[in-house]
Amino acid sequence: MSKIKESSSGILGASNNTNKESSQKSARSIALPMTYALIGVSCLNVWNSALGLNIKITYNIFQMAGLLTSSVLALFVNYPRVLLPTSLGVLTLLCAGFQIAHQTFSDSAFDTYCLAAFITIGLMAGIAQTIAFAIGTTKESNMSGYISAGIGMSGVLIFCINLILDYIVSDEKIYEINKSKLLCLFSISEIFLIITIVCCVLYIDLFPKNDNNKDSTDIEKAEEKEGRLPLIEIIKDGYKAILSIFLVNWLSLQLFPGIGHKKWQEKHGMTDNNVTIIVGMFQVFDFISRYPPNFTHIKIFKYFTFSLNTLLIGNFLRLLFIPWFVLNAVISSSFFTNIVQQCVCIAALAFTNGWFNTVPFIVFVKELKKVKHQKDIETISRIMVVSLFFGLFFGMLTTCLYDYFPIGILNN
């Protein structure tokens, strides 16, 4: 009898262990995508908070320089994974710095802090995103789409909070920046950053060389005997994804907000309320469009991912947004000045922006023909991040080209 009891207890024990393992795997399968989404949210929250508060808006170019610098360096320096939570920690300190400097520094000292902070934000956010995309794309279940989704989520989150704060906080300003809104927005950013740091420590293997078995979902490394490819061969194999990510970001930042809404407002005298609606439309539709490509296992969303060839065709078709945006600026007929039509225009640009930003990171690994080594895949991911930031940078630069064209007003 005792043997039977021991045997049955052994079976029950094994069953309990199996249940525990399955529940742990289930929890991890939820926590890991959430962690990568939080990385996307947290990296953008600080920048979006500064934009929402209109803090030294001209300093955005310095943040972009920081993003480009950190992403280009990643091509030559292999950032250790531990820099992921470290860079997020620095962003947390910068948020606290904004709160302290705004209330205690002189105008010139605050201006100096903002300049240094924007450069550092660019560097730290660039490092965090580069590392996260490099790790995420080499997962068996590609996690890079969740980072992209988090990036879109940040814009909507900060925009909505900003609108709510307009109705519930005082109008007191220091250096033309609302004191209460600055405290609230950066406090929210700090909370997200702290949660993200904890999740990174818990769910991402930050020291893979010290534990070969810890992260079983990583794609197996190629045999060491199988040498890595030269950089030119890596670029040849991944150029479609690299070009796609550049084109989508270049066009989006060239047209928004430089042409629509700024040129529209300048030419037609749009109300501030309509401008807020248009900005909100971009944030919302950019956010919405980043999710369907991550859920293609659901039948209704299966057409939201496609080949990189199709994506390139889609990016060239997006060039049709240029005449549409320009016509909205130059023609004063009731159709082109109608807020509904303008919202449709912005929503279409935003939807394709979020959608076409997410697809390349999800599908490029499957379309690689020569590249098989994990480190080579990470290299392509880093180059794609560089291409993304270069697209944003050149989009900002080429917006000013429209100032050299005689965009007048054509009446009915």
Swiss-Prot record:
<feature type="topological domain" description="Extracellular">
    <location>
        <begin position="166"/>
        <end position="181"/>
    </location>
</feature>
<feature type="transmembrane region" description="Helical">
    <location>
        <begin position="272"/>
        <end position="294"/>
    </location>
</feature>
<feature type="topological domain" description="Extracellular">
    <location>
        <begin position="103"/>
        <end position="114"/>
    </location>
</feature>
<feature type="topological domain" description="Extracellular">
    <location>
        <begin position="51"/>
        <end position="56"/>
    </location>
</feature>
<dbReference type="InterPro" id="IPR002259">
    <property type="entry name" value="Eqnu_transpt"/>
</dbReference>
<feature type="topological domain" description="Cytoplasmic">
    <location>
        <begin position="295"/>
        <end position="310"/>
    </location>
</feature>
<dbReference type="GO" id="GO:0005886">
    <property type="term" value="C:plasma membrane"/>
</dbReference>
<feature type="topological domain" description="Extracellular">
    <location>
        <begin position="332"/>
        <end position="343"/>
    </location>
</feature>
<feature type="compositionally biased region" description="Polar residues">
    <location>
        <begin position="7"/>
        <end position="21"/>
    </location>
</feature>
<feature type="transmembrane region" description="Helical">
    <location>
        <begin position="182"/>
        <end position="202"/>
    </location>
</feature>
<feature type="region of interest" description="Disordered">
    <location>
        <begin position="1"/>
        <end position="21"/>
    </location>
</feature>
<feature type="transmembrane region" description="Helical">
    <location>
        <begin position="82"/>
        <end position="102"/>
    </location>
</feature>
<feature type="topological domain" description="Cytoplasmic">
    <location>
        <begin position="203"/>
        <end position="240"/>
    </location>
</feature>
<feature type="topological domain" description="Cytoplasmic">
    <location>
        <begin position="1"/>
        <end position="29"/>
    </location>
</feature>
<keyword id="KW-1003">Cell membrane</keyword>
<feature type="topological domain" description="Cytoplasmic">
    <location>
        <begin position="78"/>
        <end position="81"/>
    </location>
</feature>
<feature type="topological domain" description="Cytoplasmic">
    <location>
        <begin position="136"/>
        <end position="144"/>
    </location>
</feature>
<feature type="topological domain" description="Extracellular">
    <location>
        <begin position="404"/>
        <end position="412"/>
    </location>
</feature>
<keyword id="KW-1133">Transmembrane helix</keyword>
<dbReference type="GO" id="GO:0005337">
    <property type="term" value="F:nucleoside transmembrane transporter activity"/>
</dbReference>
<feature type="topological domain" description="Extracellular">
    <location>
        <begin position="262"/>
        <end position="271"/>
    </location>
</feature>
<dbReference type="InterPro" id="IPR036259">
    <property type="entry name" value="MFS_trans_sf"/>
</dbReference>
<keyword id="KW-0472">Membrane</keyword>
<feature type="transmembrane region" description="Helical">
    <location>
        <begin position="115"/>
        <end position="135"/>
    </location>
</feature>
<keyword id="KW-0812">Transmembrane</keyword>
<comment type="similarity">
    <text>Belongs to the SLC29A/ENT transporter (TC 2.A.57) family.</text>
</comment>
<feature type="transmembrane region" description="Helical">
    <location>
        <begin position="145"/>
        <end position="165"/>
    </location>
</feature>
<comment type="function">
    <text>Nucleoside and nucleobase transporter with a broad substrate specificity.</text>
</comment>
<keyword id="KW-0813">Transport</keyword>
<feature type="transmembrane region" description="Helical">
    <location>
        <begin position="383"/>
        <end position="403"/>
    </location>
</feature>
<feature type="transmembrane region" description="Helical">
    <location>
        <begin position="57"/>
        <end position="77"/>
    </location>
</feature>
<feature type="transmembrane region" description="Helical">
    <location>
        <begin position="311"/>
        <end position="331"/>
    </location>
</feature>
<feature type="transmembrane region" description="Helical">
    <location>
        <begin position="344"/>
        <end position="364"/>
    </location>
</feature>
<feature type="topological domain" description="Cytoplasmic">
    <location>
        <begin position="365"/>
        <end position="382"/>
    </location>
</feature>
<feature type="transmembrane region" description="Helical">
    <location>
        <begin position="241"/>
        <end position="261"/>
    </location>
</feature>
<protein>
    <recommendedName>
        <fullName>Nucleoside transporter 1</fullName>
    </recommendedName>
</protein>
<feature type="transmembrane region" description="Helical">
    <location>
        <begin position="30"/>
        <end position="50"/>
    </location>
</feature>
